Amino acid sequence: MSDIEKLRIEMEKITADMLRLLKSRTDIAKEIGDLKSKQGRVVSDETREDELRNKMMKACDEIGFDKTLAARFLNFLLNESVKVQ
């Protein structure tokens, strides 16, 4: 097996892990949506979203990760959370 094939297998495993985590995150977002509905709260919470963005940008600094890519990914996650809520 070539080095490229080994790396591709590793990437595939990581991608599968990410999908499992995305499903877990989506399930939790649905639960949050149900609770918000029962409490008469609006779905979107700008304060919480800003708090999460700030925490994730700090995490990017700590691990040396591209903030632009992280912000795009986080925006995707937040948009999907709002959709399922």
Predicted features and spans:
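Domain-level signature for soluble enzymes in the chorismate/prephenate branch of the shikimate pathway
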Residues: M1-Q85
